Structures are given as structure tokens and as C-alpha cells.
């Protein structure tokens, strides 16, 4: 019996394990007008405070909505929560719609992209200033690319099955080590996610105006596309950060990760120093380091722990270890009214469980770069038949198809156990469907989207057509988990919380920032 099979057998000995996964979704979407252009209106008043509403906030810009579900242990419940949030939001948006694609289209100039506003409290002003820094460092266009983040955790019963009873410190150390092992395997094999679910093989030509690219784009009207691409959002054209390429953040242990992250938020940047921090009495960014704050670190997956009020993410990890992981490689699913499907969630259950149960040797920076090269190949030309990927850095290669099929042998073993625990065959059905996509890349989401883009004559037309369809779908949706009263109560509560935050400030903004960044002087 392989190590993987032995670990799976241990976990499957308690079927309840598979019913207790913790899951949450964060979905971003741009508000846009009837004419297809980006909305320039403020965050809808009927949604409450973007600063304190626990379900509905904004990301980079006023027009970039972000929906956040609470942790759920049941997939239908998770999807119901997400659908209810979309329904409520759409009822407060008037004629505006939600852009159904990761890549923005009819934006106009970067000046039309207004930074998200959160009120007059020091914490709120800091959030907006952080975004001002992002704008000046990378431009606003890159920041309004939308994605879906999937938060995932294993229950205590999972760790009990694998490691038996442990005292609190030993369990904390075990979980952190295991989540970092999962993260290493995610870098090794996570290219399957953009292969199956990448949804940005094309972009509107206006998106790369003034930017150099060596990619051999073809065009449909004003749309540029790469015939075999899966996720330009994950490419150098999308949401990546070349300034961070000098950072060497390792994933072999929580200590190594925190050390690398600590260096990143303290390391000065000559390039960003040219912007200045406070010029003529106006702040331009939080500081001139490579990362203003830890959230600026670009990564396809992150180790996470819920932080206490005022606590930095790294301090939370240092205090109590890894609690869950955040998968950040999902494009918005253009064929779902809520940006992600139940099938995708089930695949992620399977894949992340497989990544945790499989062997995961330590990984140096050289090996990490080799695996990243595989990701880049899949992002740019993943639907190319017979695409060869590297196996580590030793020169061995294997086709994407052969490699994916090997992984699916073990994913199916997990699917059988998950279906046995839950009743039914939902996980095996996902394996059946996606395995057919391995040899038929035109069936992948990027393949289907590119076909529709050609059919309708451009990406903008696709976005407008799907956006209209999903607006009607979301409006027609009846509450399944929440209710109108629950949503309105959260709106009112968020407004009150923002008011209290603004009234409780005792420091000037300068003093507040001085206190917050005191750690940089230690």
C-alpha cells in the first residue's frame, strides 16, 4: 500500500471527516452600466457600509464588489448563501449589473476607476490609502481584475485520524506543517485549476494599451486572445507583481514563511521610493517598501488564520499556526450567475484533500521556479494538445494529459470515499466530467468561453449578454438561507459599526500610521 493509500484509509475510517470540511467563498465582480461601461457611482447605499458589512464589501475600487460567505460545512448551504447575497445586492443596484468575467472591458481611462471609500475613521482611511499606493505602483486597471477565492480547512477529526490525539501545541505544529505540505503540492500540481477552470483566454484590446507584450495575440474585433490560453488573469498581463520577483518566500515551514514575509514588508524599494509617501501634505502610499502591508503579496495560495482586531496576518499565524488555506487561482466562472459552481467546489475538495494526503518533500526556490514555469505554460497554452510539463528541475517531462490522468486515479479513490460518506455519487460525477476535459480541451471553461467570444464577435458582447442573463437570474432567485430581514439587519448594523469606529478615534491619521508601522523600526 502506498503512503497516499494508507493515509486515505486512515481518514476514511471515520466517514464524518468528509462531512466537516470548512469552506468559504469570496467573489469579486465589477458593477457596470446599461451601456456596458464601468459604473462610476458610489457603493450602493442600500448595501450598508463597505467597511463593516460582513457579507458585502468592496475590493480595490468603489465599483468592485466583493461578496464573502461565512464558513460552511455543507456545499448546498454554501451555494445558497452566495446566491442569497447576489440576489440582495442586485435588488439594490438599480439598472446596474454585475460583470460576469474576470477581465474588465469597457473601462475608459484609469481616472474613471475610483478608489474604494470606507469612511472617515483612521482604519478606513488607511484602507483607501493602501489602494492609492497600489494605483501609483501598478496602475488601477490591473487592480480591477476579478477573481474568486476559496477558503478551505480540514476538521479536527481529519487530524485525529492521521495523527491520533495530541496536546494543543503539538496539534498546532502538526496542522501548520501539513498545510504547508499541501501548499507545496499546490505549487507542484495546481496548474490543473487554470487548465479546467481558467476563464480568461481573451481580453479587451484597451486593457493592454501602452503596455509591451511579446505574446502572439490574435483578434476578434477589439478582443485579443491566445488560441490555447486558459487564464491571462494569472499571466504577467494580469494580476501579478514583477516587483515581488526578488522576494524569496519559502513554504517548507511556518517559520520559513514568516521570516520571508517579515523581510518582504521591511525591504525598501528604490522604485517605490520615487513615488514618495507624503508629498505636499497628501499621502501617496503607506510606505516605500516592496510590500506596503502583507496583503500586497501576490500568491496563488495563502496560509491563513482569522486575525484578532488590529492583528497583522503574520502575527495571527505566529500566535496560533495555520487555520485554513485560501486558494486564489480561480477566475470568475462566466457560466455561473454567482461566479463559481458547485462542481468546482467539489473538485477543490478532492484536489486539496489529495494534496494534503500525498507525499510532499521540501522545496527550494529553484524547484519552486520550475513548478511556476509549468503554471505559466498552462496559463498561456494549456489547451495545446500534448503540452509537455517539467517534472521538477531534473529535465524529465510529461504531457499535461498523462500527468492529469495519473492524478485522477487517486482523486477517484478519494471521490469514492467522499460519496460513500455523503451518499450519492456527486464527487465521482465531477471526476467523470473533468476527466473527459483532459483529452478534450475545448470542453474546458476557457475553451467554451473562447468559442462563445468568436460566436458573439467579441468579449465585451459576451460580458453584456451574460451579465443581462445573470441579472435576471439573480433577481428571480428566492432566498434559500438568509431572508430580506436578515440582510437588511446586517446593512443597518454595518452602518452603526462604521459610525462607532469613526467616533472612537482618538489619534490623528499621522499618529495612527506611526503606531501601526512601529514594527518597521524594531
Swiss-Prot record:
Q: Which residues form a coiled coil?
A: none
Q: In which pathway does it act?
A: Sulfur metabolism; glutathione biosynthesis; glutathione from L-cysteine and L-glutamate: step 1/2
Instruction: From the UniProt record, list the reaction(s) this protein catalyses.
Output: L-cysteine + L-glutamate + ATP = gamma-L-glutamyl-L-cysteine + ADP + phosphate + H(+)
- Which example biological process does GO assign this protein? glutathione biosynthetic process
EC number(s) on file: 6.3.2.2
Q: Which GO terms describe its cellular component?
A: cytosol
Database matches in InterPro entries: Gln_synth/guanido_kin_cat_dom, Glu_cys_ligase, Glut_cys_ligase
Q: Name one GO molecular function term.
A: ATP binding
Query: Which family, according to the similarity comment?
Result: Belongs to the glutamate--cysteine ligase type 1 family. Type 1 subfamily.
What name has this protein been given in UniProt? Glutamate--cysteine ligase
The organism of origin for this protein: Vibrio parahaemolyticus serotype O3:K6 (strain RIMD 2210633)
Amino acid at each position: 500500500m502506498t503512503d497516499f493509500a494508507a493515509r486515505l484509509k486512515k481518514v476514511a475510517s471515520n466517514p464524518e471527516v468528509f462531512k466537516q470540511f470548512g469552506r468559504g467563498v469570496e467573489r469579486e465582480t465589477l458593477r457596470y452600466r446599461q451601456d456596458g461601461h464601468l459604473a462610476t457611482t458610489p457603493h450602493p447605499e442600500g448595501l450598508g457600509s463597505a467597511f463593516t458589512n460582513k457579507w458585502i464589501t468592496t475590493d480595490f475600487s468603489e465599483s468592485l464588489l466583493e461578496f464573502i460567505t461565512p464558513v460552511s460545512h455543507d456545499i448546498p448551504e454554501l451555494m445558497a448563501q452566495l446566491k442569497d447575497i447576489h440576489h440582495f445586492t442586485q435588488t439594490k443596484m438599480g439598472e446596474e449589473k454585475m460583470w460576469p468575467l474576470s477581465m474588465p472591458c469597457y473601462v475608459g481611462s484609469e481616472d474613471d476607476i475610483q478608489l474604494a471609500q470606507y469612511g472617515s475613521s483612521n482604519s478606513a482611511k488607511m484602507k483607501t490609502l493602501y489602494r492609492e499606493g497600489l494605483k501609483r505602483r501598478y496602475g488601477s486597471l490591473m487592480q480591477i481584475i476579478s477573481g474568486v477565492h476559496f477558503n478551505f480547512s480540514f476538521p479536527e477529526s481529519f487530524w485525529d485520524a492521521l495523527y491520533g490525539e495530541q496536546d494543543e501545541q503539538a496539534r498546532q505544529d502538526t496542522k501548520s506543517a501539513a498545510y504547508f505540505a499541501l501548499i507545496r503540492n499546490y505549487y507542484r500540481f495546481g496548474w490543473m485549476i487554470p487548465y479546467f477552470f481558467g476563464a480568461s483566454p481573451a481580453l479587451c484590446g484597451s486593457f493592454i494599451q501602452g503596455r509591451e507584450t511579446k505574446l502572439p495575440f490574435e483578434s476578434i474585433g477589439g478582443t485579443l486572445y491566445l488560441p490555447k490560453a486558459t487564464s491571462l488573469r494569472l499571466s504577467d498581463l494580469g494580476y501579478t507583481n514583477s516587483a515581488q520577483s526578488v522576494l524569496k518566500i519559502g513554504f517548507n515551514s511556518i517559520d520559513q514563511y514568516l521570516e520571508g514575509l517579515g523581510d518582504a514588508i521591511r525591504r525598501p524599494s528604490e522604485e517605490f521610493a520615487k513615488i514618495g509617501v507624503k508629498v505636499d501634505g497628501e499621502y501617496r502610499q503607506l510606505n516605500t517598501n516592496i510590500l506596503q502591508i502583507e496583503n500586497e503579496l501576490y500568491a496563488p495560495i495563502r496560509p491563513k488564520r482569522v486575525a484578532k482586531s488590529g492583528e497583522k496576518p503574520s502575527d495571527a499565524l505566529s500566535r496560533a499556526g495555520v487555520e485554513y488555506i485560501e486558494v486564489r487561482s480561480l477566475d470568475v466562472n462566466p457560466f455561473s450567475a454567482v461566479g463559481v459552481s458547485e462542481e468546482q467546489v467539489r473538485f477543490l475538495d478532492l484536489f486539496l484533500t489529495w494534496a494534503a494526503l500525498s507525499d510532499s518533500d521540501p522545496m527550494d526556490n529553484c524547484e519552486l521556479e520550475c513548478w511556476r514555469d509549468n503554471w505559466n505554460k498552462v496559463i498561456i497554452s494549456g489547451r495545446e494538445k500534448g503540452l509537455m510539463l517539467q517534472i521538477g528541475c531534473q529535465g524529465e517531462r510529461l504531457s499535461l494529459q498523462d500527468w492529469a490522468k495519473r492524478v485522477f486515479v487517486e482523486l477517484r479513490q478519494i471521490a469514492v470515499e467522499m460519496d460513500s460518506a455523503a451518499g450519492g455519487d456527486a464527487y465521482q460525477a465531477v471526476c467523470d466530467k473533468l476527466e473527459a476535459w483532459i483529452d478534450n480541451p475545448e470542453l474546458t471553461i476557457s475553451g467554451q468561453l473562447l468559442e462563445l467570444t468568436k460566436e458573439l464577435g467579441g468579449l465585451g458582447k459576451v460580458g453584456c449578454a451574460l451579465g443581462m442573463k445573470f441579472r435576471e437570474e439573480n433577481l428571480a432567485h428566492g432566498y434559500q438561507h438568509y431572508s430580506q430581514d436578515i440582510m437588511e439587519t446586517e446593512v443597518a448594523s454595518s452602518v452603526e459599526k462604521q459610525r462607532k469606529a469613526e467616533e472612537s478615534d482618538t489619534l490623528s491619521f499621522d499618529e495612527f500610521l506611526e503606531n501601526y508601522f512601529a514594527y518597521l523600526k524594531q
